Amino acid sequence: MQEYYIGPDLNTQLAALLQKLNVTKVFLVRGKKSYTSCGASDVMDAVLNGRGIKTVCFFDFLTNPRVEDVRKGVHLCKSQCPNIILAVGGGSALDMAKLIRYHIYKETDSYIPLVVIPTTAGTGAETTHFSVCYINGEKQSIADSAMLPDYAFVCSELTSHNDAYLTACTGFDAVAQAIESYWSVNSTDESRSYSLKALGLLWKQLPLLIKNLDNKELRSEVAEGAYYAGRAIDITTTTAPHAFSYKFTSLYGIPHGHAVALTFPYFFALNLYGERLQSTLDSYEYGQRMKLLVQFLDADRSDFLSCQLHMSTYISSLGLSAKALTFDELASAVSSFNEQRGRNNPVVIDEEVKSGLQNYFMELKESDKE
């Protein structure tokens, strides 16, 4: 069971935890420039140096962690014998720390407590039991209970350095997580309660935050909403929009949240209509669930295109678009997607769905010419 803290005064809360755990040595997995620019370095210096805690830093890894980077981190961490692993950064830093702890546990049966502090709002890495890692250029999702952080601190002040684009990418990832978890075949009463709680903090607030980046109240709500979106997908995992997103990142360098947004309007409409559902779903219950989601998001469900346009308009308000990619680049996702995530989707992903997605991309590029 994870312990978590959401709010200000990170210094006091973290210091109290370190004292409780009798920490004398920390293996710190962190970002590079962002670690200083977000103010985390000042907080960590004050808390760790103030208690005389020895710190070993690891930041020698790419933005999208590779298995080679994980091996380097595992080797260094094992050689240092820390009391805890502390991760401070965006999704990549947190995933790296989770993978390091997981591999050490599997190799040595030694369980090192993991404390995470996200500096972006939206990846969900602080509250999930899975991580992503690139193996031979392919993005793999690895799930295990040993990757769930033991402690998470969500402090919105550390996200205040995020510019509009980063805020949009990570924030929309959280919105997508909440919605995908809600319609997932693995959805439960608990996960749906987390999804709706997340959307109540994200849906209206995120576009406002993009236009008012210095608004502390909006920052706080979005950070909290992102945490609960992570709680939701920790139960259900993600669905089709995530399944089709990975190639956009690995081949074309599109940040993850932006990559998810590229297909989201199509799958939003497809899943709200709910034709050709997975056999495990009750069509009446699913239909009632989608009615509530439509009301919650104030969406137009009068026809497929109106539903699709509703989400497209929302994503455009965040400044995210497909203009940077050609039709061929967009279409590459159709033939290459994560089948495991695809099976979580409420509507069966078959050739007709893939053809519909390709037509959607074609319409996108035609609209770019206008």
How would you label these PLM feature ranges?
Residues F327-E370:
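Short, amphipathic C-terminal "tail helix"
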Residues V43-M44, K72-V74, A93-T108, T128-F130:
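Short Gly/Thr/Asp-enriched flexible loops that form oxyanion-binding sites at enzyme active sites
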Residues I254, H258-E329:
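Gly/Pro-rich interdomain helix-loop hinge
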Residues A168-Y228, A232:
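C-terminal and late-domain segments of enzyme folds
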